[in-house]
Amino acid sequence: MYKRQRLASQKARELINVGKEVEFICVGKKGKASLSSEFGDKIIDFFDFSEVRNLSFVQGDQIAQKIITLFEEDKFDICHLYFSKFESVLTQIPTEQVIIPCNLQVDDNEDSPSQEACYEYEPGEVEILSDLLPKNLSIQVFSALLENFASEQGARMTAMDNATRNADEMIDKLTITYNRSRQATITSELIEIISGAEAL
């Protein structure tokens, strides 16, 4: 699970080496703890949802609103989001996603018309985008929170399954050792009884 922190640290070092200023907003105690040793003075905010039983859009929106506020104050020009993408119970992929500026590229797999379509917007494009872009950011952050949560649960399931399997193997080995010891004790007692009977 620490691979995403390593990915974020590596990117931060690259940016610092070329003279860029880097700041972090951390989500979760472990993420903050792993980044604090090297980038403690660069952590500007921290969100802890460990007491939240069920993640909801509210948590994603809290983080997104903080990002939007900082962006509107011209505190940064690019925002990277780091999280673990859930592939399977055994596989979680550390992922980097640029959420500001907004990615406007069309997917190559999608059929795109050779000629750009002309649309009319009501209200105007600026009004629509000023409403949609913050919601889009909140959704992206919430989606990353859910992916990360699913990855965390998958990693826990795998760890618990491995621990259970190891415990079962240990119980089997201890049972065999106990049975051998018990058998040796019984055999020893039988030999003593037989030796005592022969002596009579």
Question: What is each residue range found by the language model?
Answer:
Residues K3-L200:
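C-terminal beta-strand-loop-alpha-helix "lid" module of Rossmann-like NAD(P)-dependent dehydrogenases
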